Design a protein with these regions (language model features):
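Bacterial N-terminal signal peptides that target proteins for export
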Residues: 2-17
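C-terminal motif of bacterial Sec signal peptides marking the signal peptidase cleavage site
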Residues: 22-26
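Bacterial signal peptide processing site
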Residues: 28-31
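Secreted/processed peptides and extracellular or luminal domains of membrane proteins
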Residues: 33, 50-51, 87, 99, ...
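Primary mode marks residue(s) on the alpha4-beta5-alpha5 output face of response regulator receiver
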Residues: 46, 50, 149-150
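Post-signal-peptide N-terminal segment of Sec-exported extracytoplasmic proteins
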Residues: 49-80
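Short, charged/polar surface micro-motifs in flexible loops or helix N-caps
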Residues: 83-90
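Extracytosolic low-complexity repeat regions of secreted or lipid-anchored proteins
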Residues: 92-168
Length: 168
């Protein structure tokens, strides 16, 4: 059976167009990030393999650094595993789905959340104009929970006050 030339040309053009579209969708630029100091920690590898395909309804993006993650286009949620483990702080500490997070709003509307009481520490930067911080932290809780908690945030009510006046 002979196929008419015009049909063969249209089929070839359609196939070329489809192939081009597939290639272009796979060529989205990786989100440029720097790895954290302790990104080579094996616990970070476990976190990365458990990262969700979407966070706060934002699709996962490829990154160019070890132990990182990004979601949204442009990226609205960024993750770094292996950041410096925070010590005691006066910044607010929130517990979201069993994970303690220190909240830093110094760059609002971009909020920085860092795990407290986990080593390696994980930092999440959220553009609150694009996504809900709470939703993003809930979506990431399963991956982050792979790093065991060794301590927890304390509030003023958790710290015992001395019952006697100190002697001089």
């Amino acid at each position: 059976m002979m196929i008419p030339r015009s049909l063969a040309l249209r089929s070839g053009a359609a196939a070329s167009l489809l192939l081009s579209a597939l290639l272009l969708t796979g060529c989205a630029a990786a989100v440029p990030l720097e790895p954290a100091a302790d990104a080579i920690n094996p616990a970070c590898a476990d976190v990365v393999v458990h990262l969700p395909a979407s966070v706060a309804d934002q699709p996962a993006r490829e990154t160019n650094a070890q132990a990182t993650g990004a979601w949204g286009d442009p990226a609205a949620v960024l993750m770094h595993c292996g950041v410096t483990v925070p010590g005691p702080t006066t910044l607010p500490c929130l517990n979201v789905n069993g994970i303690d997070w220190i909240e830093d709003d110094a760059d609002a509307p971009r909020y920085r959340y860092t795990t407290y009481g986990r080593d390696p520490a994980i930092e999440i930067v959220i553009d609150s104009e694009k996504v809900s911080g709470t939703t993003a932290l809930v979506d990431l809780a399963s991956a982050v929970s792979g790093v065991p908690a060794t301590s927890a945030c304390l509030g003023v009510e958790d710290v015992p006050l001395p019952t006697e006046a100190p002697s001089l």
